């Protein structure tokens, strides 16, 4: 996580991960523009609960509308991608201003959610479910 001067503008970057999704979030001061894979944020993430979940770090730190966000996200589905976006935004906000650490840490936004899909085992119907057992 490096701070760099990109065309004389302070740019901060954070990488977020969730399930099999990876999001790279670039934050710089602006008017609140949010682009995900060169598309508008609302058209990329259409479910309202996923949208609010992804933007919750900005709401908690009272920075919604103060920064422009450019996000590249790939892998997984829309739920994993929005979780990765939330993780990336949190890391970038922490890099931008370290006073955000306590707020983000207490809500668990800086912690990587390590839950993944458990693999199916042979001799069983699913990961944990067994085939139906018949005594006779």
Curated annotation (Swiss-Prot):
Keyword Ribosomal protein in record: yes
GO process terms (BP): translation
Key word Transport present: no
Highest taxon, organism lineage: Bacteria
GO molecular function term, any single one: structural constituent of ribosome
Entry GO terms, CC: cytosolic small ribosomal subunit
InterPro entries per UniProt: Ribosomal_Su5_D2-typ_SF (IPR020568), Ribosomal_uS9 (IPR000754), Ribosomal_uS9_bac/plastid (IPR023035), Ribosomal_uS9_CS (IPR020574), Ribsml_uS5_D2-typ_fold_subgr (IPR014721)
UniProt keyword terms in alphabetical order: Ribonucleoprotein, Ribosomal protein
Family note: Belongs to the universal ribosomal protein uS9 family.
HAMAP family per record: Ribosomal_uS9_B
PANTHER family recorded: RIBOSOMAL PROTEIN S9, SMALL RIBOSOMAL SUBUNIT PROTEIN US9M
Stated name of the protein: Small ribosomal subunit protein uS9
Lineage: Bacteria, Pseudomonadati, Spirochaetota, Spirochaetia, Spirochaetales
């Amino acid at each position: 996580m490096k701070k760099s001067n990109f065309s004389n503008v302070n740019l901060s970057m954070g990488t977020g991960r969730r399930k099999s999704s990876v999001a790279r979030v670039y934050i710089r001061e602006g008017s609140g523009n949010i682009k995900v894979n060169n598309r508008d944020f609302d058209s990329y993430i259409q479910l309202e609960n996923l949208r609010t979940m992804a933007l919750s770090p900005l709401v908690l730190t009272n920075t919604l509308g103060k920064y422009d966000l450019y996000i590249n996200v790939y892998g997984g589905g829309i739920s994993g991608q929005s979780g990765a976006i939330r993780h990336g935004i949190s890391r970038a906000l922490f890099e931008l201003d370290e006073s955000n650490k306590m707020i983000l840490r207490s809500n668990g936004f800086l912690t990587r959610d390590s839950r993944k899909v458990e693999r199916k085992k042979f001799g069983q119907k699913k990961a944990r479910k067994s085939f139906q057992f018949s005594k006779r």
